[in-house]
Amino acid sequence: MPPDAAADSPSALMRVLVLDDDHLLLEVMREMLAACGPCEIALELDARQALARLDEAMPDVLICDLVLPEMDGIEFLQAAASLGYAGKVILLSALEDEVREAAADLARALGLRVVGSFRKPLAPEQLRDALEC
């Protein structure tokens, strides 16, 4: 079966990777994603660990904070693009709208499929709309 065939299968679970350095936000995101329906959820506090996960298996959706220690969200997105990530990207940050939109534009210029750029805290409706669930 081709690698993308499982993702196209109606019975396949949506795979989501959430990268944020806030433990509480990761748990809130887990609950919000679970409320969207069955999915495989991976949570990462560290961008390098998240890149290792991407290198092992590409998720369908990547939810990424922009402000991270050691490697910021932009650097992470550049690395994800260089790995060939082709799934949806949702950006999260407490930064100003202009900064988030500039990051989204940069991610799109890298070939990433940004489906949302939201200010923290993310509302459940925003997540559902971005994921179409």
Predicted features, each with a name:
Residues 43-61:
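Acidic, metal-coordinating helix/loop segments flanking the phosphotransfer/catalytic sites
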Residues 46, 72-78:
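Acidic catalytic/metal-coordinating carboxylates
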Residues 98-99, 119-131:
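C-terminal output helix
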Residues 23-42:
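Two-component/phosphorelay signaling modules centered on CheY-like receiver
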Residues 55-57, 79-86, 109:
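Conserved phosphotransfer cores of two-component systems
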Residues 69:
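The feature encodes the CheY-like receiver
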Residues 20, 65:
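Active-site residues of response regulator receiver
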